[in-house]
A protein has these predicted regions:
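Active-site HxH/HxHxD metal-binding segment of metal-dependent hydrolases
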Residues: 79-80, 85-194, 221
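Divalent metal-coordination and catalytic microenvironments
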Residues: 42, 62, 72, 104, ...
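Metallo-beta-lactamase
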Residues: 68-78, 173-185, 192-194, 199-292
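A short catalytic or substrate-binding loop motif that flags glycine-/basic-rich loops and adjacent residues
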Residues: 52-54, 185-187, 206-209, 365-367
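Conserved beta-strand hairpin/beta-sheet module of binuclear metal-dependent hydrolase folds
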Residues: 33-95, 215-231
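Short Pro/Gly-enriched beta-strand edge/turn motifs at strand-loop
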Residues: 17, 40-46, 169-176, 196-198
Length: 367
């Protein structure tokens, strides 16, 4: 779930409004289906559709000798392979895929990685935590939901009908992800990998996923940003039942601060969603500021004890429906856990196993 949480930005805002925020878009618009835009030397920007409100993922091809290194892949659902066939035969000129690089393990990024790797006998490149987490989630496909997961959502304030829906939907990760290769090539933070004779530096971020990789071609300032720096929306930062006391928001904010010290403002950001843009420093600052503003709103809403599901209005501009309830709950708990670890909130569990959260500040100190 990518949301408009972090800067209060409506994804449909005008280009002029966005320009006022310090971002510029060098291209007139995104590529059409089956087509590509050359955004930098030897780099193609393409799109694959997704059947949801966030209706696309950007995928990129970087010239690599006689073929292409592909960055991210789209969901393994009907129609996506057909889109890839058009891209492979069209803008990619029928040349082979030399390697598949996935920025992180979310299904829209790795869904067809296994298919592309198998078709072209190409290696898969990922960070270790992302690969291992993907393999773990794939292994859960079709399994029964653990009771610890039900308890997690009960503690957040879900009713029994909602918990039953969680049980029915558990283990669906593999429904949109083709089987991954049994081996992979690890990429590490700070490592330089050579694509087409040019160096790309791996820059890792945490919070949205465990070990998200950006790739930075420093000689001309091109950054394959994945979900780390999106132009108009903020990447989901969630706590999940597997690690209920995690602090992904702390990890996310630390990563954003680090990115500020790494990327110059004029780099060309190639994001996974939205349009290619410049203004990295401005956007990173807005993402950080937005979460701190949200934390202050959250603290003010917690003058009286509330459950995680009760704080949605303080965090989200839109109503939360069943389709995104899990991600919204995870993001709410991420903010609550952050406050708990900062000492600005307390948590008490009642006899029914429900957690009640209360602020220890007036809201101004929460962030």
């Amino acid at each position: 779930l990518e949301t408009d949480l972090a800067d209060g930005v409506n994804p449909a805002e005008t280009e002029a409004r966005t320009a006022e925020r310090g971002l510029t878009y060098p291209f007139a618009g995104p590529p059409a289906s089956g087509e590509a835009i050359r955004v930098a030397e030897d780099v193609l920007w393409m799109r694959v559709a997704m059947p949801m409100q966030l209706d696309h993922i950007n995928v990129y091809a970087v010239r690599d000798g006689d073929g292409w290194a592909v960055v991210d892949c789209g969901l393994a659902i009907p129609g996506t392979k057909d889109e890839w066939e058009l891209l492979l035969a069209g803008p990619m000129g029928g040349d082979p895929v030399t390697r598949v690089i996935c920025t992180h393990m979310h299904p829209d990024h790795i869904g067809l990685a296994g298919w592309l790797c198998e078709r072209f006998d190409a290696p898969l490149l990922m960070t270790r935590l992302e690969y291992v987490m993907a393999r773990m989630l794939l292994a859960d496909t079709g399994k029964t939901a653990p009771e610890s997961g039900a308890a997690f959502y009960r503690a957040a304030g879900w009713d029994e009908e909602q918990i039953e829906r969680y049980r029915k939907e558990f283990g669906r990760f593999g429904m949109a992800v083709a089987p991954l290769p049994a081996s992979y090539q690890r990429i590490r933070d700070g490592e330089r990998i050579v694509i087409g004779g040019r160096d790309w530096t791996v820059v890792v971020g945490e919070g949205h996923s465990p070990e998200h990789a950006c790739l930075w071609r420093q000689d001309d300032g091109v950054v394959l940003g994945g979900d780390q720096i999106l132009p108009r929306i903020s990447s989901n930062v969630s706590v999940w039942p597997t690690e209920a006391d995690a602090d992904p928001l702390g990890d996310w904010l630390t990563s954003l601060e680090r990115m500020k010290s790494v990327f110059p403002d004029d780099v060309l950001i190639l994001p996974s969603h939205g349009e290619v843009f410049r203004g990295a420093q401005t956007r990173l600052e807005a993402l950080i500021r937005g979460h701190h503003v949200a934390l202050k709103r959250l603290a003010r809403s917690l003058k009286e004890p509330k459950r995680a599901v009760d704080v949605f209005p303080a965090l989200f501009a839109r109503p939360v429906g069943d389709g995104v309830r899990g991600m919204a709950t995870g993001e709410a708990i991420a903010h609550l856990n952050y406050m708990l670890l900062q000492g600005t909130a307390v948590r008490e569990r009642d006899a029914d196993g429900v957690d009640w959260w209360r602020s220890t500040t007036n809201g101004e100190e929460a962030a």
